[in-house]
Amino acid sequence: MKPLIVIALAVMLPCSIAALANPSGVTLLGWPALLVLAVGAYCLQWLAFIPARLGETERFYDLTGSMTYMAITLSAVGVSPSSTWPQWLVAALVIIWAGRLGRFLFERIHQAGGDQRFDHIKVSSSRFLVAWTLQGAWVVMTSCAAITVILSSTHPPVGVIFALGAICWLVGFTVEVVADRQKSQFRADPRNEGSFINTGLWARSRHPNYFGEILLWSGIAVMAVPYLSGTQWVVLLSPLFVYGLLTRVSGIPTLARRGQQLWGGDPAYQSYLAQTPRLIPRL
């Protein structure tokens, strides 16, 4: 598919969802507030793309994405017609997640000196722009449920559904943090150079960090349920988008190919693949 078509689809589909999910009557600059914030998310990616392309560097890619999450979340808080503790909680959860992951990925890419995913992309303006645009789509699609809650003028009672969503977020966030920390410690040990991780959470799932991320965004979507009505139910596509992207497009498939290149001939690795669940951890 041509880059311009990919870019157009990556902008139009999430922006359409943002327009449908916008709480009634909440505007920014005369337009639906959620749509304006979505467009702003893309604009931040495109602005960051310019110096990144000139320097042929991806070192600030993940950090830009995390800062975009925080920027649109704080902007939503600023323009929201309502201010209740559940809305503040949802905003805080997004900011905590984005701040933690942004710092982690920024430190990792600087320690590694780069990200191999971009080796053949950053030298092409069109392909690199696609990557930055897709990050904008990722931000908009994953955060739309949270932003819908923050912008809402309704005050539904906080009940079991909201609490269950918060618990899902907490469990998912904890799993992601622990998995990332375990892998970082594994890589930092010189004795593990050239080896694959199969200890800790990684002994129970081949991709526990992705499981945690899918679970936490599912939690945000569940927390949004009491606030949804009409076309706003479209935001429940958010966790499905996260799942699809991580399991079918850029996450697990990419790592699976790299794993086969590095350890495909290792019987221990093949045994690990056969005995360890791909995503949902074995209890």
What spans do the regions from the language model cover?
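Interhelical loop and helix-boundary elements at the membrane-water interface
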Residues: 1-4, 52-64, 106-134, 261-270, ...
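Short, amphipathic, aromatic/basic-enriched membrane-interface segments that mark the entry/exit
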Residues: 2, 31-36, 53-61, 203-208
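Hydrophobic transmembrane alpha-helices
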Residues: 3, 7-25, 41, 45, ...
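Short juxtamembrane and helix-loop transition motifs at transmembrane-helix boundaries
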Residues: 21-29, 49-56
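Membrane-helix interfacial "entry" motifs
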Residues: 25, 29, 33, 58, ...
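Loop-to-helix transition at the N-terminal end of transmembrane alpha-helices
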Residues: 28-44, 58-70
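Short, charged cytosolic
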Residues: 31-34, 101-109
